[in-house]
UniProtKB/Swiss-Prot annotation:
GO molecular function: metal ion binding; UDP-3-O-acyl-N-acetylglucosamine deacetylase activity
Record's protein name: UDP-3-O-acyl-N-acetylglucosamine deacetylase
E.C. numbers: 3.5.1.108
Gene3D superfamilies: lpxc deacetylase, domain 1, lpxc deacetylase, domain 2
Example of a GO cellular component annotation carried by this entry: membrane
Domain of life of the organism encoding this protein: Bacteria
Keyword Methyltransferase among UniProt keywords: no
GO BP, sorted A to Z: lipid A biosynthetic process
Lineage: Bacteria, Pseudomonadati, Pseudomonadota, Alphaproteobacteria, Rickettsiales
Length: 288
C-alpha cells in the first residue's frame, strides 16, 4: 500500500460549532511523509502551523483542540481527521482562516465529499501502520479504552447515557472502507438542558439543528428529520475515536475496545502507547 494525498485543493466555508465564527478551510495536496499539517492563514507569521499530532492536543472538552508552542490553536479537528483517515489520505495541508474547523452538518460526510471531489493521488512511498504489540488500557472512573495486538484493525465500542433517547448502544467495526458509507454521516449530539451553561462558557455558540442532534428535557429528538440511524449516537462516537486516533500520524492496527469513551480518553491512549517503545512498531502493509 502506498501513501496518498489529494489530486487538487478543495475548499469549504462554514461556522464553528463552539466559537460560532465563520471560517474558510482548504485541503491541499502534500508531499510524501508530510502527514497532516494545519496552517492558520489569518495569522501572518511563520509560527502559524500546527502538526495534527497527539502531542499537540491541548484541549479535549467536547472536541479536540491542537496548539503549537506559540499558543496558536485550532479546535474541533476530529471530524475532518476522521474523514482523512476514512478516505486514506496520508498527507495534506489544511489551511484555515480562523480558530475552529467548520462543523458542517455535524458529521464527516461533507469532508468526505470534498476529498472525493478533489480525487486521490498515490505517492511514491509506502503507507506506515502503527502495529500494537502488547495490551494497553486507560481507565477514568467508569470509562475505559484498551487495545490488544491484532493483525487487523477492529473496534468494539459501547456508549451508555442516562437518556431514553440514547441509552446503551454498541457497535463493532472492522472495515475501514465501510467508514464513508456507514459511519461518516453520523452527527454530533447534545442536550438542550446544557446549552445555556455551555454558551456561558463560550461553547456551542454555533450549534443548531443543522449541525447537531438536539435532545430535550423529555428525551425527545428535536430535529425535524429525526435520526439518520437508530444507533447514530454510537456511530458518531466511533467517528470521533477514528479522528482522534489519526493524530497518531498513521493507521493504528489493533483490536480496540471502548466503553463510554471521550476525546480525553482517546488522547490518553495514544500517550500511553507511545510512552513505551516496546508496545508498538511501525510497519508497512507487507509486514502486518
Amino acid at each position: 500500500m502506498q501513501q496518498s494525498t489529494l489530486l487538487k485543493p478543495v475548499s469549504c466555508y462554514g461556522i464553528g460549532v463552539h466559537s460560532g465564527k465563520r471560517t474558510q478551510l482548504t485541503i491541499e495536496p502534500a508531499k510524501e511523509n508530510t502527514g497532516i499539517i494545519f496552517i492558520r492563514t489569518d495569522i501572518s507569521s511563520e509560527n502559524n502551523y500546527i502538526e495534527a499530532s497527539y502531542l499537540n492536543v491541548s484541549g479535549t472538552l467536547l472536541s479536540t483542540t491542537i496548539s503549537n508552542d506559540h499558543k496558536v490553536q485550532i479546535s474541533t479537528i476530529e471530524h475532518l481527521m476522521a474523514a482523512l483517515w476514512g478516505c486514506e489520505i496520508d498527507n495534506a495541508i489544511i489551511k484555515i482562516d480562523g480558530p475552529e474547523v467548520p462543523i458542517m452538518d455535524g458529521s464527516s460526510k461533507l469532508f468526505v465529499f470534498m476529498i472525493e471531489c478533489a480525487g486521490k493521488k498515490l505517492q511514491n512511498a509506502p503507507r506506515k501502520y502503527l502495529k500494537i504489540l502488547k495490551d494497553i488500557k486507560v481507565i477514568h472512573k467508569d470509562c475505559e479504552l484498551y487495545c490488544t495486538p491484532s493483525n487487523h484493525m477492529t473496534v468494539d465500542l459501547t456508549i451508555d447515557f442516562n437518556s431514553k433517547a440514547i441509552g446503551k448502544q454498541n457497535l463493532s467495526f472492522s472495515n475501514q472502507e465501510s467508514f464513508t458509507k456507514n459511519i461518516a454521516d453520523a452527527r454530533t449530539f447534545g442536550f438542550i438542558k446544557d446549552v445555556h451553561d455551555l454558551q456561558s462558557k463560550g461553547l456551542a455558540l454555533g450549534a443548531s439543528f443543522e449541525n447537531a442532534i438536539a435532545i430535550n428535557e423529555e428525551d425527545k429528538i428535536l430535529n425535524p428529520n429525526g435520526l439518520r440511524y437508530e444507533d447514530e449516537f454510537v456511530r458518531h462516537k466511533l467517528l470521533d475515536l477514528f479522528g482522534d486516533l489519526y493524530t497518531s500520524g498513521t493507521n493504528v492496527v489493533s483490536s480496540i475496545k471502548g466503553y463510554k469513551t471521550s476525546h480525553a480518553l482517546n488522547n490518553e491512549l495514544l500517550h500511553k502507547i507511545f510512552c513505551d517503545t516496546t508496545s508498538y512498531k511501525f510497519v508497512t502493509a507487507s509486514e502486518l
